Amino acid sequence: MIEDTKERAMRCPNCGNLVYPRINPVVIVAIKNDQDELLVTKYAHASYSKFALVAGFIEIGETSEEAAIREAKEETGLDITDLTFYKDQPWGFSSSLIFTYVAKAHGNQKITLEDHELKIAQWVTRNDTYLDPKDDASITSEMIHKYLEGEL
């Protein structure tokens, strides 16, 4: 495969077939409850050991909003509402385009972990400054930092 001179793609020098870059669409959701606490998670089987937010891939035929609602339900058992778009971020490490949202989990819903995905899901407050990932470039870290600063 060689770089094509006209397209942002790779071209097979033998048959001319073009292969375009693939982007994996992903959602991340910052879920807050009625007490303005933030739900943070830790992955069950990943090398990433910091706190994260609910996240997952967008499935074929699904909007990013539908994926955010589905991932929240699958991973935590929570029904979310008031979904508000935060921003997007290209993430070259995994060829992803990340769409982020802030949502609400109203009432006294019970967290039910999807244990093959998550090992921890817990509510935190703005006083839990040990969570602050100031030096991390990820949009997840930005969202957690903004929450702790009272800006999310």
Model-predicted regions and their roles:
Residues 1-6:
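Short, flexible, mixed-charge glycine/proline-rich loop motifs
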Residues 85-88, 123:
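Hydrophobic/anchoring residues in structured secondary elements
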